[in-house]
UniProtKB/Swiss-Prot annotation:
SUPFAM superfamilies: Nucleotide-diphospho-sugar transferases (SSF53448). GO terms for biological process: F420-0 metabolic process. This is 2-phospho-L-lactate guanylyltransferase. GO terms for molecular function: GTP binding; phospholactate guanylyltransferase activity. PANTHER family: 2-PHOSPHO-L-LACTATE GUANYLYLTRANSFERASE. It is an enzyme of class 2 (transferase). Homodimer. The gene is cofC. It catalyses: (2S)-2-phospholactate + GTP + H(+) = (2S)-lactyl-2-diphospho-5'-guanosine + diphosphate. NCBIfam families: F420_cofC. It comes from Methanosarcina barkeri (strain Fusaro / DSM 804). Keywords: GTP-binding, Nucleotide-binding, Nucleotidyltransferase, Transferase.
Amino acid sequence: MKAVIPYKKSSAKSRLSPVLTREEREEFVDLMLNQVIDTLKEAGVGTIDILSPSMYGLENMTKANVLLDKNDLNEALNGYLEQAEEPVIIVMADLPLLSPDHVKGITSTKEDVCIVPGKGGGTNALFIKNPSCYRVRYYGSSFLTHCSIAEKTGQSVEVYDSFFAGTDIDEPEDLVELLIHGSGAAKEYISKKFRLEMSRGRVGLVHI
């Protein structure tokens, strides 16, 4: 089994721009990427590949292999799956609440495919036992699309239901979940910039 993490550092996480500058966002995504790599390693994943259209921010990467592919996300990932000769777990780089136990649970599925849904219909992680027989289609309601692809190709599916694994960091309100539930370098970075504040019965962010 091996893992692949799609990653692009340049101008990353534009939806966080109301609260983080471009430089801060790029620093933050780097921390999240490294945290996801460490999580995969702790879960016993031996081979970890980073699939990126650019070496920007990855020049000194030693914890994982860097594979350059300038194609769009789906084309790059499907090219990767075509060449894979062992099960593959695709993990997004913005999952700082993901734990080694989550990875072990996802990859120990008895089904052909295990899908971790993200917020708004996305796909946060996707474990594929027979990658040469599967093609991904991210963007939009990719969770439903990936379930449909498995069904149409005769592959059984498990949906891995986890709040933590399902929390990807895209919007300012997602940083609240990181501060409440997170640990590690990504949380430490955000905790130096924001604190939690109750307002009208809701927890929100306030700049320090």
